[in-house]
Amino acid sequence: MTEQKVRKELKTDMPSIYSFELHEMKEWLKEQDEKPFRAAQIFEWLYEKRVTSFDAMSNLSKELREKLKAQFAITTLKTVIKQTSQDGTIKFLFELHDGYTIETVLMRHEYGNSVCVTTQVGCRIGCTFCASTLGGLKRNLEAGEIVAQVLKVQQALDETDERVSSVVIMGIGEPFDNFEEMLAFLKIINHDNGLNIGARHITVSTSGIIPKIYQFADEQMQINFAVSLHAPNTEIRSRLMPINKAYKLPKLMEAIEYYIQKTGRRVSFEYGLFGGVNDQVHHAEELADLLKGIKCHVNLIPVNYVPERDYVRTPREQIFLFEKTLKERGVNVTIRREQGHDIDAACGQLRAKERQEETR
């Protein structure tokens, strides 16, 4: 039995079949005295035909279907809330088997449909501007529960003959704090027999867990990599992101340079603009100095208002000035397009709102 299979079987008595990679399914079939080629058939039913019952897998023997039913669950998510924005963004609040809720967002772009997935129930990182960390971390998601989010959104898109064209792992939780499950998820959605989403159409983001950045670099995946930076120096970053006290900014930059050297890929830096905190011209100049010589791109993010937090949005004129200052210093930068502004679009907001209503 492989290490990964042990990892999954420790999670629950009935692991999600979506948590298994193709080679793991082949190994399981061998253990059951079944032909390994059946794995591709099972994956076709799961990811192309998107059935939610083993009984629907009509080209498998009844005996094999019974074995599958006895050992695996097909993870299903219950839609608790579905909010649709005027710009087409859809935010889902899904309920898991144990009653916990998670958020998933469908964002519509000119180039296709992007899904933002959650990797944890809650978050332990404690960023002082984020609604996701309110209430702390409850548990990690299994790879199958992350896969199920993409499939649930894809099922909604099937009604209009559309498909999920890209995935971003920027929802609730710190992906690198759930590293093994996140990695399995990446491999499943990228695989030809899985959801077949190209590596260049997948983005994973981290707040800066340095040891995992090195580990991720060594995987040498051609997946887009983003780092939540949000500050040009240690003092401001420690105020915004307590993780900076454990993983210092200079060491984080060293890890990022290792990633670039190892993969040949550029890094995206997420930089949320908070009024009067990190959005002045001198902050932009300091940020340009920090990133000098690094193969990177900066996404400036006009932050969504979170009622439980004290930060305010940077005025639009100041955002443009910040962008202009970076460009003048040779930094590749764009302002992220705002989506879902008329719904509970900030990460963790919908879940937090639902929890508040439950406690009234």
UniProtKB/Swiss-Prot annotation:
GO terms for molecular function: 4 iron, 4 sulfur cluster binding; metal ion binding; rRNA (adenine(2503)-C2-)-methyltransferase activity; rRNA binding; tRNA (adenine(37)-C2)-methyltransferase activity; tRNA binding. One of its GO terms (biological process) is tRNA methylation. GO terms for cellular component: cytoplasm. InterPro entries: Aldolase_TIM, Methyltransferase_A, RlmN_N, RNA_MTrfase_RlmN, rRNA_lsu_MTrfase_RlmN/Cfr, rSAM. [4Fe-4S] cluster binds at residues 123, 127, 130. Keywords: 4Fe-4S, Cytoplasm, Disulfide bond, Iron, Iron-sulfur, Metal-binding, Methyltransferase, rRNA processing, S-adenosyl-L-methionine, Transferase, tRNA processing. Its EC number is 2.1.1.192. Its main location: cytoplasm. It is found in: Cytoplasm. NCBIfam families: rRNA_mod_RlmN. HAMAP family: RNA_methyltr_RlmN. This is Probable dual-specificity RNA methyltransferase RlmN.
